[in-house]
């Protein structure tokens, strides 16, 4: 049936004596036009017996818009750190969306991270590799994927230095595999489709201590195999937009922290080491500066950009929260010692300065003003509250950390 027929049936079921017809040139549509869904943008519902129909009209609009906005979203890396937060947000905030989570379940991916949403009717989990062309093509066709949030990536800089080919294969070839699958599956029409590639601030290179912050117009200067692989994947995403018109969008974020992060990154690793009285290795003098963003705020930003961002654009996502590594370690020690009921400063003795790693960028900082001005987003979680919440989660989930580490 046509959408006019559908609207007529809804009106009939509601018991209203109304006419459903195309808009005339001087009329506003009953259902407001949405950014990606314009099928009902010319539909008019006319009440024949009353002067106002706002109460039921609102209900009708909600019903039809929910059906019209039903989407099939593929989230790659959805069992990882950031991906699990994004998958949880989308699965619960948009129950009318079908969420397909694709994750290889490497050492950093864990079904436990999404165990609370796996039973939901709108969630499907697939264990698989984004470089598997046949699998990815099948997922796009079988699940009628019309939106992608691509988070799957190898992301540890130290590991990239020792195994650059792994990073090149997974981060570059994996991204191209997804882009090709989207291009083929969406070849009939790009309307209502979106490919959102999640990247890092490390593609921009390093800043001096007084060098301002990275904006979306900064040139790329990656210094590690990890950042080079992400920079390359960013360029492929842009190339698919420029060459094929694929509706892509890129976000580059600063350092994330929060629950479910594999304990190889600074914050979860140091919490784990403090609890187990192990050394806290600090590179060089600890003077390197990073901008920190709570993972929940990042997930909300991705939601905002995915739904409201402009295709072909790039958006930076930062926390406006710069800390030197050594100052962060000191603050982390304060909180963990306090939460454990230990004497203040007890764990300072665990700090161990080690040789700086190769290509260690001095400072990262992200300018998120474009995202704030165009999409009205800014981080909500204060760093102290987020850090304390993170510490408490890891202290309450020590078995999760043990099981995660045992996977290697």
Language model features: what each stretch is:
Residues 48, 117, 206-207, 259-260, ...:
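Residues that scaffold the ATP/ADP-binding catalytic core of kinase and kinase-like folds
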Residues 12, 37-39, 117-120, 167, ...:
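Short, hinge-like loop/turn segments at secondary-structure boundaries
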Residues 68-256, 296, 306, 325, ...:
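N-terminal Rossmann-like NAD(P)+-binding domain of SDR-like oxidoreductases, especially those catalyzing
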Residues 86, 208, 261, 265-266, ...:
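Acidic donor-diphosphate engagement hotspot in glycosyltransferases and nucleotidyltransferases
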Residues 15-16, 187-188, 196, 203-210, ...:
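Proline-centered turn/helix-capping motifs that create local helix->coil transitions or kinks
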Residues 52, 102, 153, 263, ...:
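A broadly tuned, weak detector of single residues within folded domains
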Residues 1-67, 72-73, 128-131, 268, ...:
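C-terminal substrate-binding subdomain of Rossmann-fold SDR/epimerase-dehydratase oxidoreductases
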Residues 41, 62, 174, 233-236, ...:
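Internal, well-ordered alpha-helical segments in soluble enzyme and binding-protein domains
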């Amino acid at each position: 049936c046509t959408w006019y027929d559908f609207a007529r049936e809804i009106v009939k079921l509601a018991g209203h004596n109304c006419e459903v017809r195309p808009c005339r040139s001087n009329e506003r549509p009953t259902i407001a036009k949405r950014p990606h869904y314009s099928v009902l943008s010319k539909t008019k519902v006319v009440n024949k017996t009353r002067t106002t129909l706002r109460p039921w009209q609102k209900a009708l609009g909600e019903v039809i818009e929910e059906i019209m906005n039903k989407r099939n979203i593929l989230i790659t890396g959805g069992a990882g750190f950031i991906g699990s937060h994004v998958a949880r947000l989308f699965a619960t905030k948009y129950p009318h969306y079908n969420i397909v989570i694709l994750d290889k379940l490497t050492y950093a991916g864990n079904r436990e991270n999404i165990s609370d949403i796996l039973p939901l009717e709108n969630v499907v989990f697939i264990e698989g590799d984004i470089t598997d062309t046949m699998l990815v093509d099948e997922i796009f066709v079988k699940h009628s994927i019309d939106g992608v949030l691509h988070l799957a990536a190898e992301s540890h800089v130290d590991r990239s230095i020792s195994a650059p080919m792994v990073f090149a294969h997974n981060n570059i070839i994996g991204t191209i595999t997804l882009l090709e699958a989207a291009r083929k599956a969406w070849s009939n029409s790009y309307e209502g489709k979106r490919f959102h590639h999640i990247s890092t601030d490390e593609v921009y290179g390093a800043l001096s201590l007084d060098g301002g912050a990275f904006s979306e117009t900064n040139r790329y200067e990656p210094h590690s195999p990890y950042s080079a692989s992400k920079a390359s994947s960013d360029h492929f995403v842009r190339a698919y937009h420029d060459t094929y018109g694929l509706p892509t969008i890129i976000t580059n974020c600063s350092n994330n922290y929060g629950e479910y992060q594999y304990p190889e990154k600074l914050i979860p690793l140091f919490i784990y080491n403090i609890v187990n009285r192990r050394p806290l290795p600090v590179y060089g003098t600890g003077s390197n500066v990073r901008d920190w963003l709570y993972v929940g705020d990042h997930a909300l930003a991705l939601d905002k950009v995915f739904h409201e961002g402009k295709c072909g654009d790039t958006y930076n996502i930062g926390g406006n929260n710069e800390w030197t590594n050594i100052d962060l370690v000191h603050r982390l020690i304060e909180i963990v010692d306090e939460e454990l009921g230990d004497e203040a400063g007890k764990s300072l003795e665990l700090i161990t300065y080690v040789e700086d790693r190769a290509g260690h960028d001095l400072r990262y900082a992200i300018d998120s003003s474009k995202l704030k001005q165009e999409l009205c987003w800014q981080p909500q979680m204060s760093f102290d509250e987020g850090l304390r919440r993170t510490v408490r989660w890891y202290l309450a989930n020590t078995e999760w950390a043990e099981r995660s580490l045992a996977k290697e």
